[in-house]
Amino acid sequence: MKIVISHGSGGIGTAETFARDFFESKGYEVHLIDYFTPHGIRNLAWGAGKYQDHHDCTFSEMFKVDFPEGDIIHIGFSLGAFLGIINHERFVHNYLFYPGCIAFTQSMLEKDYTNASVIVGTEDTGQNKYNAFKELLKHPPAMHYYLAGAHHAFMITDIDRQFDMVRYGIPKGVMDQQEFDELKPNHKYLSERYGHKTLRTILKSNNDYRMQYLTIIEEEIREHRTKF
């Protein structure tokens, strides 16, 4: 049994390394997946002003990663949770923290996500696209945890900031596979194709929830280890 952790838009940071250290202390083999560095990406800013993303690799290219062999428990944060949705069939269980869903296709809707759990804060303002995706699923995640008062990125250590996050007008309905495969973290491309607006976004740590839900995940893995 291996645990794989996928980072969010900030790259590998404290959310990922804290989770790694937690599970390694319990005796698990843990792998951090870095899907940015192979494409020359340090982080994604999701800004419309001075800090714009201008990368030419597509999300589909970024999310084609080499997972370790064997049974995998996946833990994804934000954009890493979206990577988890894309590669869901590879995992025996899939824990998705505040998923940063960009768009979805018919093939994504046809997957069975009942072996997934979603953990999101009630104050996270960026879940509209995931919620639209969830409502169309025939086999949605078995568990959805809604954490009272928690904001996006609550698993990160010592973060408390606000910024104007760009929101592109990508349709909330089913997207053609070819169009999906053309999506890339490039502000000029996405804005010209879909338009954009900005939304004040809060990123804020919650250490209590972090420990609580890492502990819950570890207990579930241990309890169902023979099943996995």
What residues fall within each predicted segment?
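C-terminal catalytic histidine-bearing segment of alpha/beta-hydrolase fold enzymes
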Residues: 141-228
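Hydrophobic/aromatic beta-strand patches that form the interior of the parallel beta-sheet core
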Residues: 4, 31-34, 73-75, 95, ...
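Primarily recognizes the serine-hydrolase "nucleophile elbow" in alpha/beta-hydrolase
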Residues: 57, 62-113
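The feature captures the conserved acid-bearing segment of alpha/beta-hydrolase catalytic domains
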Residues: 93-152
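Short, hinge-like loop/turn segments at secondary-structure boundaries
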Residues: 47-52, 112, 161-164
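Glycine-rich His-Gly loop
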Residues: 5-10, 78, 99, 121-122
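Short aromatic-enriched loop/helix-cap "lid" or pocket-rim segments at secondary-structure transitions
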Residues: 42-45, 108, 130, 155-160
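Serine-hydrolase catalytic machinery in alpha/beta-hydrolase-like enzymes
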Residues: 2-67
